[in-house]
Amino acid sequence: MSSVSGVRTPRERRSALRSLLRKRRQRELASKVASTVNGATSANNHGEPPSPADARPRLTLHDLHDIFREHPELELKYLNMMKMAITGKESICLPFNFHSHRQHTCLDISPYGNEQVSRIACTSCEDNRILPTASDAMVAFINQTSNIMKNRNFYYGFCKSSELLKLSTNQPPIFQIYYLLHAANHDIVPFMHAENGRLHMHVIFENSDVHIPCDCITQMLTAAREDYSVTLNIVRDHVVISVLCHAVSASSVKIDVTILQRKIDEMDIPNDVSESFERYKELIQELCQSSGNNLYEEATSSYAIRSPLTASPLHVVSTNGCGPSSSSQSTPPHLHPPSQATQPHHYSHHQSQSQQHHHRPQSPPPPLFLNSIRAP
């Protein structure tokens, strides 16, 4: 008991001393941990600067990036121990290679700027939203013959080309990346083309404001591995993600192309899909050329460009835009010459020779991506 004069008893003094020492040890321990990760955070600990005895080597920002790159789990622990969420954003340069993407950051693309935003500071992501993984996308790839209508937006990008569809069955990452992107952004238009026996994909976003969650990016890179380059760019005022194949790895998954092709042939193509390909015609041409396929002008000099979805020349399409006219039934689509106004000189030379021999000379078929571009 304390005396009347207010003097503490020995027991009270020992209790107060133990409490003081315990609080001091807690402050010292917190100061040591904070100064080890980032010396600047120690000044925020009760507003007291660290004492000289507690001084530790401070890590620079570059040191932290190197550590987090080698040990991603430490980055998560570092973010979890922070009491206040960081609000910093980092601008990115276009074209942006996804392999240079910082972990745990989302991508915000808009007319106001292109930035990487930390996941914990992102205001667009929903906490209760669960996105599919690369494994989920592989399961969907295996079961795609049973879910044609669910993934119909993906098959529109083949424009009913059996050659492109056959290539896709040997390249699961193309489907996986589309599947992951479509789960995060529904307003996308995929387009496929081939070069040197490899299938490539361009995904056009129809909105000017695009948000790609960090979980989606991580799973895309998991599916792409080192065989595909995934880049984001703005082409003709549209956000585009290009998936280019560098090497085709052997896949143990086998898809029945015959069943897949038959179901796709039976699928109706909506008019708005035809209109979207017509609207993005010049954009698609530029994307194909930028990815290394520069055969467009050479091929159009000798072949009529066919409509992507009806497989018929554009100049015999009916005026209502819903189908070919009656004249298209009398002549096979691949024998229609281009219009007189757009015929090049050497095409006229070939045409005169074909009239003399009563048949058109044999020439190699046009590139596969020409089946998906309409003539002006």
Curated annotation (Swiss-Prot):
Phosphorylated at serine residues in the N-terminus. This phosphorylation regulates the localization within the inner nuclear membrane. Phosphorylation by viral kinase UL97 at Ser-19 plays an important role for correct viral nuclear egress complex (NEC) localization. One of its GO terms (molecular function) is zinc ion binding. Residues 33-45, 317-332 have a biased composition (Polar residues). It comes from the Viruses. A zinc finger (CCCH-type) spans 106-211. The keyword Membrane applies. This is Nuclear egress protein 1. The lineage of its organism: Viruses, Duplodnaviria, Heunggongvirae, Peploviricota, Herviviricetes. The gene is NEC1.
